[in-house]
Amino acid sequence: RVPELVFLNLDEAFGRTEGDEEIQDLLQGSRGLNLGLHFLSGALTFDPAVTKVGAELASRIVWLDAFLTNVDRTFRNTNMLMWHKELWLIDHGASLYFHYSWVNWQKHAVSPFVQVKDHVLLPEASGLEEADAEMKRLLTEEKIREIVALIPDDWLHWSESPGRPQEIREIYIRFLCERLAHSETFIKEAQDARKALI
């Protein structure tokens, strides 16, 4: 599960009274349209020593993070919450890290994603091949195109931009479709890393 996604506008006054300069810089850089997650009041940080996750769910989450190249769901920082006895995924900001350097995005699309070895749920993820089959059934090129089309143009204008918004969207689509078509590469990497753990 992922908390409800919402679009929100932050005006210039937001965060002016924040004492931490680094956070204030982040808030000032976030003026305008943002993507946020519904606040899960009373949620607790997921602790793998306290809460066990079944193999099917763990495998799906590991698959998703390997697909999106999310480097930030580790034992040190799980980026998961327990809320009403359910597991919720938060903070996907470290995903798709190829977009910090557009050079060789094609190479990144077919990479094995070696960072999966640090995934907090990897020890429980014994059903990766089944998760792969299920996710490929659900996540088609058409669905990827629908999702990427939702990205506002304003979010696709930056100084290091490789092109106009539609060109950038097309790179994201091609990246995700290539990743999906070559999922056996990151599945094998995850399986090998899991064998080394157990």
Residue spans of the language-model regions?
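Phosphate/dinucleotide-binding and metal-coordinating scaffold of catalytic cores
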Residues: 1-198
